[in-house]
Amino acid sequence: MTTRTEAVKAYLLDLQDRICAALETEDGGARFIEDAWTRPAGGGGRTRVIGDGAVIEKGGVNFSHVFGSGLPPSASAHRPELAGRGFEALGVSLVIHPHNPHVPTSHANVRFFIAEKEGEEPVWWFGGGFDLTPYYGNIDDCVHWHRVAERACAPFGADVYPRYKAWCDSYFHIKHRNEPRGIGGLFFDDLNEWDFDTSFAFMRAIGDAYIEAYLPIVQRRKAAAYTAQQREFQEFRRGRYVEFNLVYDRGTLFGLQSGGRTESILMSLPPQVRWGYDWKAEPGSEEARLTEYFLQDRDWLAASN
């Protein structure tokens, strides 16, 4: 493991600790359970799960560090020159599914890949981002989420937030439904256009921004009253989350194709979901407004003006 990889690993382990501590404090009841694991083909990780809390119905904050002699197809398909290289992949990935339909589901991920081949320069890149999936939309929450994202990106250039915001909107799109998974945030991958130190600093800025972006929303919404009908709608919308993760998500595909730990990879799935045949929201309802207004590619910073 190189000095660079050691620095990334130390940051990611600390990030996992800090996020878990903040979420436990906010929940006020449940605690994370850690499951340390090793990967027979090389590497391992720390899976931390939380559930049946006062706020969090199910969540996980995972750290993994895996390595192998060749990249799986999901990682090399869009960069065929990497085929046959040994690799190391480190990351923290998290998903939080709250009980209350008024509290959005959140997802965040930061990761580092390095691919090496004897006699050639190592190829490295960073990836990550965070995105929000509301069930009952709130403009203030969307604006806050994107404002934190913009602030995290600002030191790295005025074009960074709009570029990675647009990439997030494009990436988290459920093609067979022709709708976005949520209201977006940031997404970046294959990041090596800056030098290593700047790229690493950017990954840290995004990782550190997650709690600042999410917890104020949780605090505002966690005590809101909700009905059984609203809970059913939350479970219906969770079905879209499952569809995206199992069909399109690059991290899920990479994990399964590289012989990753199935329990950790599928940790992102919600605990209760429902599907209804050709279900449609009642016109003019809050449920209809979710798709008509909130689940659109929108400039949320402009919405605050």
From Swiss-Prot:
Give the Enzyme Commission number. Answer: 1.3.3.3
Q: Which GO terms describe its molecular function?
A: coproporphyrinogen oxidase activity; metal ion binding; protein homodimerization activity
Pathway given for this chain reads: Porphyrin-containing compound metabolism; protoporphyrin-IX biosynthesis; protoporphyrinogen-IX from coproporphyrinogen-III (O2 route): step 1/1
Q: What class of enzyme is it?
A: oxidoreductase
Q: Which reaction does it catalyse?
A: coproporphyrinogen III + O2 + 2 H(+) = protoporphyrinogen IX + 2 CO2 + 2 H2O
Cellular component (GO) terms are: cytoplasm
Write one Pfam family the protein is assigned to: Coprogen_oxidas
Annotated a divalent metal cation binding lies at: H97, H107, H146, H176
* The UniProt record lists the keyword Oxidoreductase: yes
Keyword presence, Transcription? no
Needed cofactors, names only, are: a divalent metal cation
Q: Where is this region: Important for dimerization?
A: 241-276
Compartments annotated for it: namely: Cytoplasm
Q: Where is the signal peptide?
A: none
Q: Where is this site: Important for dimerization?
A: H176
The record lists substrate as bound by S93, N109, V110, R111, G259, G260, R261
Write out the transmembrane intervals: none
Record keywords, A-Z: Cytoplasm, Heme biosynthesis, Metal-binding, Oxidoreductase, Porphyrin biosynthesis
Q: Which family does it belong to?
A: Belongs to the aerobic coproporphyrinogen-III oxidase family.
NCBIfam families, alphabetized: PRK05330.1 (NF003727)
Which function does this protein serve?
Involved in the heme biosynthesis. Catalyzes the aerobic oxidative decarboxylation of propionate groups of rings A and B of coproporphyrinogen-III to yield the vinyl groups in protoporphyrinogen-IX.
List the HAMAP family: Coprogen_oxidas
Q: What protein am I looking at?
A: Oxygen-dependent coproporphyrinogen-III oxidase
> What organism does this protein naturally occur in?
Pseudomonas fluorescens (strain ATCC BAA-477 / NRRL B-23932 / Pf-5)
* Encoding gene, per UniProt annotation: hemF
